């Protein structure tokens, strides 16, 4: 057993003799002071802690919280009641009276005795749950635990194995029977009830456990059903980040398990830099310091620097794959190249096993905000009920803080920008909240001032408050950011002309679009995911050097359920090995100007390649079963009677927000933005040979090989999702009913490609009028030479044309009236003459 083995190894290292213990007990305090400057050991603030047996070895360890914090006082008080003056056993268990035998002190390996990783979801009802019971209760319905959306996505890519249903999760879980068990306000609960009625396949009642991957003795089944490889792919690659495992131990991926995944700091290098001399400083996989990070009140000291909040890099430990929102937020774009070279002349060090180029950072990141400053407790911990996709579990929208040009955030109706419908939300003003939610009172409580802003779904935004007509965002890192709402900025005329036109002049933009459709400066776009799952086994494939296998992260999580492994701090040494080796490649990368489409909320959104697998599967005998195969979803799905190609273009919030929005032309004059793809590639479903050839393309040598094999069915580029007739040719999202590509009608409405021709087909001399004006402008020096001058000219032409047409329209009734008056005056004398003659 892993824990017992570690205990034996550490016992030999740390307990070579009882005399050694006496030396350690006398010298640890001075030693720790030199090893961890700035991070105070517990004994400094609680001298009585020295009486705990734990301190005989761990005297230099940092305070888990600030000594004056309510949490630290509660820990120490409870520790005294339990007979531990240092309070260690409150979270870790063990025997604080034992000072000679580590095995006894650590209480063995069973979860009922000792918790080396107190945050682990497998035992945290006994640790974190003592004070944070509601958070512990809801962790099992968190999307970070179930990963149901990710699982459904891979199943979709392998031929829509479950259709739109989010059937499977890492672990079996179901909703509470009482609707009032959902954490949040009554308004929020009612709102979520309505969403469940709209999207029952996403807001599900229960998840079944993910099916097992093929065992070594089952590989013969692949030839009959290659889709079984999907479960190997999911379990080896996709699920290593979920909440119930410590995950991959690579640079950038080091983290805790369960609550500790977020609330314990780990550096990218994974080394411990605190004051506990018993922790090996040469080994990776350790926390940076033994202190909890969380809200503004939770101060963490590392060497001589004190910070608060959860750093973005903690979140990026997991959020560096898939939509890559974590690294994108930081301004990092994945690249296949290892440049620029490191200081020693070697390659750029791998981070999350990848390499990066520096891009523009999200403006919120630039302002010092972290993920938790926008994302609420319900977003990350769960509200206790299942939501099987990101868009389902996140309750916030841009307008919640920024409002619109004509309404403050508190004047907006609930559900604005979160409609899950094709029209904007309507209704009465949402107002503000006067108090926080009950289950978040242990965090930092900010002065409500004129009220806490409400999220789109009706919960208080507990760090964002109204102050008159302004908004204050209290960041976990300690900043109080005062922001002007859009309504204020428009009133003060502080919005650029482009912004005024886009947000104030074109109503449909805010009625139908996500703010980030324009304000995302870039999006990582990895076109074509070439997945190979190689099941070659040496006994079936004599020329193979080894039998290929990998680590099953879901099985590792379930192994934690076993009594002897509930308290394990990680998965090292686990035997959860399954056959198959997964490798991934891409066709090409882009970042600029993402295409647009419709998301599940019914709004225009950026799209990026989601899961676009071209699947290659190698059987146990080393022979290919599938090569470059793209599955199709079931007939009838995604607006296709035959079944759409399952290469998905996913609606995304890129987390690359900037004040400067993308240009009008980047949408209205772009085929890519409309979903028509990137021009320039040849058909991917053709084999491409590169060798000596004749002018009519006959290959001259007899001995040649294809440079690029054909990819079956892919008769268009990876970036195309719809054709010019509005026929969708690939899937666009696979979670929600409304996600799709633009229709033909929408394409025509959006596209302004070729607008230049409207003027220039008549210029300079195609008609007498334009020829005359062009020559006058040319010889008087008025021809526009810059974009600004051109815009001014077009503006003048538009105004002149408009006034001229208005004048004509106004002149017509005036002429009619004048003509009538003239006619009446003309015929009146005739009538008068007739009357005189008759007299």
Annotate the PLM regions.
Residues 772-804:
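Short, aromatic-rich amphipathic segments at membrane interfaces
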Residues 39-68, 83-85, 140:
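Mature N-terminal segment immediately following signal peptide/propeptide cleavage
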Residues 827-839:
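Cytoplasmic C-terminal tails of single-pass
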Residues 65-85, 102-121, 143-150, 254-260, ...:
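Gly/Gly-Pro-rich "capping" loops immediately C-terminal to redox-active cysteine motifs
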Residues 22-32:
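Bacterial N-terminal signal peptides
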Residues 1-19:
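N-terminal secretory signal peptides that target proteins for export/translocation
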Residues 515-568:
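Long, well-ordered mid-to-C-terminal structural blocks that present hydrophobic/aromatic surfaces
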């Amino acid at each position: 057993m892993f824990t017992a083995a570690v205990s034996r190894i550490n016992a030999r290292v740390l307990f070579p003799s009882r005399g050694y213990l006496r030396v350690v007990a006398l010298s640890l305090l001075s030693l720790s002071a030199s090893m961890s400057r700035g991070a105070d050991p517990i004994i400094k603030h609680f001298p009585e802690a020295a009486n705990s047996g734990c301190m005989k070895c761990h005297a230099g360890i940092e305070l888990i919280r600030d000594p004056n914090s309510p949490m630290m006082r509660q820990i120490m008080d409870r520790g005294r009641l339990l007979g531990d003056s240092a309070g260690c056993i409150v979270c870790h268990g063990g025997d604080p009276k034992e000072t000679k035998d580590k095995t006894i002190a650590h209480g063995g390996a069973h979860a009922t005795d000792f918790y080396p990783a107190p945050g682990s979801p497998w035992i945290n009802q006994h640790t974190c749950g003592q004070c944070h019971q509601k958070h512990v209760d809801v962790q099992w319905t968190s999307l970070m635990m179930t990963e149901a959306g990710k699982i459904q996505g891979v199943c979709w890519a392998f031929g829509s194995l479950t259709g739109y249903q989010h059937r499977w999760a890492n672990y079996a879980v179901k909703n509470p029977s009482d609707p009032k068990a959902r954490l949040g306000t009554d308004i929020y609960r009612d709102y979520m009830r309505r969403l469940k009625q709209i999207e029952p396949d996403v807001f599900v009642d229960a998840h079944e456990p993910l099916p097992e991957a093929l065992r070594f003795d089952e590989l013969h089944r692949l030839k009959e059903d290659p889709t079984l490889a999907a479960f190997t792919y999911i379990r080896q690659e996709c699920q290593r980040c979920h909440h119930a495992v410590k995950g991959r131990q690579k640079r950038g991926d080091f983290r805790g398990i369960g609550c500790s995944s977020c609330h314990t700091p780990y550096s990218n290098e994974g080394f411990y830099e605190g004051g506990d001399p018993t922790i090996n400083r040469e080994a990776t996989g350790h926390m940076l310091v033994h202190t909890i990070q969380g809200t503004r009140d939770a101060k963490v000291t590392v060497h001589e620097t004190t910070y608060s909040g959860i750093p973005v890099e903690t979140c990026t430990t997991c959020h560096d794959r898939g939509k890559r929102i974590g690294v994108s937020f930081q301004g990092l774009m994945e690249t296949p190249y290892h440049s620029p070279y490191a200081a020693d002349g070697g390659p750029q060090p791998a981070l999350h096993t990848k390499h990066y180029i520096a891009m523009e950072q999200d403006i919120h990141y630039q302002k010092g905000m972290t993920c938790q400053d926008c994302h609420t407790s319900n977003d990350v911990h769960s509200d206790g009920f299942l939501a099987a996709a990101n868009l389902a579990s996140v309750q916030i929208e841009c307008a919640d803080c920024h409002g619109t040009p004509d309404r403050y955030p508190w004047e907006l109706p609930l559900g604005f920008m979160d409609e899950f419908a094709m029209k904007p939300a309507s209704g009465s003003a949402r107002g503000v909240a006067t108090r926080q939610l009950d289950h978040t009172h242990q965090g930092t409580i900010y002065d409500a001032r004129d009220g806490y802003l409400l999220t789109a779904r009706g919960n208080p935004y507990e760090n964002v408050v109204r102050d008159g007509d302004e908004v204050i965002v209290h960041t976990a890192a300690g900043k109080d950011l005062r922001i002007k709402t859009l309504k204020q900025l428009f009133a003060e005329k502080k919005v650029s002309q482009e912004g005024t036109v886009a947000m104030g002049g074109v109503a449909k933009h805010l009625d139908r679009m996500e703010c980030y459709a324009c304000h995302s400066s870039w999006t990582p776009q990895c076109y074509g995911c070439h997945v190979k799952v190689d099941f070659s086994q040496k006994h079936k494939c004599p020329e193979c050097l080894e039998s290929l296998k990998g680590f099953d992260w879901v099985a590792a999580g379930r192994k934690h359920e076993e009594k002897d492994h509930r308290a394990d701090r990680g998965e090292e040494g686990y035997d959860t090995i399954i056959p198959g080796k997964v490798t991934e490649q891409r066709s090409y990368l882009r970042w600029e100007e993402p295409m647009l489409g419709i998301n599940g909320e019914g709004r225009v959104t950026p799209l990026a390649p989601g899961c676009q697998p071209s699947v290659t599967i190698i059987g146990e005998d080393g022979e290919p079963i599938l090569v470059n195969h793209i599955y199709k979803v079931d007939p009838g799905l995604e607006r296709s009677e035959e079944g759409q190609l399952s290469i998905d273009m996913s609606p995304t919030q890129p987390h690359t927000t900037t004040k400067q929005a993308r240009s009008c032309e980047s949408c209205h004059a772009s085929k890519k933005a409309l979903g028509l793809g990137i021009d320039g590639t040849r058909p991917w479903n053709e084999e491409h040979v590169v060798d000596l050839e004749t002018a009519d393309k006959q290959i001259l040598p007899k001995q040649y090989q294809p440079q690029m094999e054909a990819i079956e069915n892919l008769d268009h580029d990876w970036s195309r999702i719809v054709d010019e007739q509005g026929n969708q040719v690939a899937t666009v999202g696979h979670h929600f009913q409304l996600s799709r590509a633009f229709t033909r009608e929408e394409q025509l409405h959006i596209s302004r490609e070729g607008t230049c021709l409207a003027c220039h087909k008549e210029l300079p001399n195609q008609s007498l009028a334009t020829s005359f004006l062009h020559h006058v402008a040319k010889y008087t020096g008025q021809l526009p030479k810059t974009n600004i001058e051109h815009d001014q000219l077009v503006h003048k032409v538009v105004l002149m044309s408009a006034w001229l047409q208005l004048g004509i329209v106004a002149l017509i009734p005036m002429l009619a009236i004048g003509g009538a008056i003239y006619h009446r005056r003309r015929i009146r004398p005739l009538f008068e003459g007739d009357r005189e003659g008759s007299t």
